[in-house]
Structure formats: C-alpha cells, structure tokens
Curated annotation (Swiss-Prot):
Its EC number is 3.6.-.-, 2.7.11.1. The gene is BUD32. PANTHER family: EKC_KEOPS COMPLEX SUBUNIT TP53RK (PTHR12209:SF0), NON-SPECIFIC SERINE/THREONINE PROTEIN KINASE (PTHR12209). GO terms for molecular function: ATP binding; hydrolase activity; protein serine kinase activity; protein serine/threonine kinase activity. The lineage of its organism: Eukaryota, Fungi, Dikarya, Basidiomycota, Agaricomycotina. Its main location: cytoplasm. It comes from Cryptococcus neoformans var. neoformans serotype D (strain JEC21 / ATCC MYA-565). It comes from the Eukaryota. GO terms for biological process: tRNA processing; tRNA threonylcarbamoyladenosine metabolic process. This is EKC/KEOPS complex subunit BUD32.
Length: 289
C-alpha cells in the first residue's frame, strides 16, 4: 500500500480534472491528543493546518512504464518549481508531502478568493490539468464568445468588498499580480496555466500589506529557455482576462506595466517583442479557425 493511500481515504474529493483529483484534508496527519494521567481531561495540540492533496492518477490509455515516468517527472518538477519560487520570494503554497511513486503532492490550503472570483468571474469550476496547447485553444475560443457578447455588471464579490474595506482598488490588485509574475519569471520558471483561477488573494492581517497574491497549481510549469516561453505565459493570462472578465483591457494593462517594471527593461524588451508576435499568431488563428 502506498504511503499516500490513508491520506487520500481521509480526504474529501473537491475537484476532478482530466489529469488529477484534488482532495481537501483538515490536516496532513490526525490531530494528536494528550491525556493527563489520573485525569479525565485532555487537550489537543496547536490548530492543524488544512492541506490539499493532488493525486495524478494512473492513465490507462498510456503504457504503464511511460505513465509512471511522466507522472514522476511532472510531480517532481512541480514540487521543485514551488520550492524554487518560494525561495525567490514568490508566494506559493508550501509543499508538505510528496509521494512520487503514488503520484501525490500535498500543499497547504490557501484561504481566500481567486482573482477570478474577486473580478466577478463566478465560482470556480472543475480543475482540469491539460496540455498547454489545449489551454490556449480553450481560452481563445472563450475569448471569441465574450467578444460578441456583452455581459452586464454583476454584484460585487465578497472578496472585492473585503479588499475595498481595506482600501485596496482593482488597479492595486493588478499591480500586485504583475509584480508576482515578474518575480516568478525571474526564476526562469513559467507557470503554464496562468489564469485568474490560479491566482489567490489571501488577506494578511498584521503583515507588511493588507493582502498577498498566491500563485497556485504549478502542474504545467516548466523551465523557460527563450523569451517566447514567457510571452506565451503572459498571452494565456491575457486571453483568460478577455474570456472571463469583459472590458478587462485596462486591468491587464496594469498587470503588464508592473510586470515590465519588475523585470527591468533589458529582460522585458525581448519578451515584449515576442508577446506581440504571439498576439499576431493568435489573431490570425481566430480569423482562420
């Protein structure tokens, strides 16, 4: 029996995608209880830390050897990418468990709201861990739909109200996103699935600021080799904004502005050129189908 089996059996399945199942647990291990001899009283240790377990289950359509290899490679890189990002000052979930053989990675559960929810994109749907090309196609198709459909402004989300009560504007939020992405790309890691669903806003009472941006779900992350790799990461986010948040051009412009400042002109210039190329290819693809 794999070491992760008891953990998965204790967890509650909260999301399922094409590549992984996500479970929630109140803590990684059962909360210990201390009993005093000669007394019926007892007390528990400090409050447990809620965790998320992501299980990359076996793909029966793949050869077992290939499946085990790919699962191990992706899981290992995800764990290393999270550790490297955290070391560079990017706020990401803490990794608390890695079972390479079973394909399970455990992380702290982030309490807060996704940027998607805050900007009125609705509740989160299924999490699907899919290939980067499929992500781009799906995002682009949704973007086409939103371009021809005007959506009415909905009520303010709970997260947006909480930020407003702290004096935080949407513009400030966009700048924080841009700064977080710049820190990530400085590590030469690309996220691979940059959407507003994969960015959490966590309030930080007593911290240096009222909130922080937490980047989550590094299942498609990879090592960047060329400026175009960063440009594609940014383009996926741009199309996600257009798809989920109508009239978001100004918001995304704030993300890019702060991102460029964070990277510095020398590194930003080649990425900016490639981003324009990627946009042109995307528009051509939209027109030709």
């Amino acid at each position: 029996m794999a070491a992760s089996t008891p953990l998965l059996s204790r967890g509650t399945l909260i999301k399922q995608g094409a590549e992984a199942k996500v479970y929630a647990l109140p803590s990684l291990f059962p909360e210990p209880t201390t009993y005093h001899p000669g007394s019926s009283s007892s007390f528990s240790a400090a409050s447990p830390t809620p965790v998320i377990l992501k299980h990359r289950f076996t793909k029966t359509y793949r050869h077992p050897t290939l499946d085990a290899y790919l699962t191990s490679q992706r899981l290992t890189f995800e764990a290393r990418a999270l550790a490297r990002a955290a070391k560079a000052g990017v706020t990401v979930p803490k990794v608390v468990w890695v079972d390479e053989k079973a394909g399970v990675i455990g992380m702290e559960r982030i309490e807060g709201w996704s940027v998607r929810e805050i900007l009125g994109g609705g509740a989160e749907g299924e999490v699907e861990v899919i290939e980067e090309q499929e992500i781009e196609e799906d995002v682009e198709n949704k973007a086409e739909d939103s371009a021809v459909r005007e959506e009415p402004e909905g009520p303010e989300s709970e997260g947006l109200k909480a930020l407003k009560n702290l004096g935080v504007t949407q513009e400030h939020l966009m700048r924080s996103i841009g700064a977080a992405l710049a820190r990530l790309h400085k590590t030469m890691i690309i996220h691979g699935d940059l959407t507003t669903s994969n960015m959490m806003v966590r309030l930080t009472p007593g911290g240096s600021g009222p909130y922080e941006i937490v980047l989550i779900d590094f299942g498609l992350s990879s090592q960047a080799q060329f400026p175009e790799n960063y440009a594609v990461d940014l383009y996926v986010l741009e199309r996600a904004f257009a798809s989920t948040h109508p009239r978001s051009e100004k918001l995304y412009a704030g993300v890019l502005e702060t991102y460029a400042e964070g990277l510095g002109e020398k590194k930003w210039k080649p990425i900016q050129i490639k981003l324009k190329d990627v946009r042109r290819r995307g528009r051509k693809r939209d027109m030709t189908g």
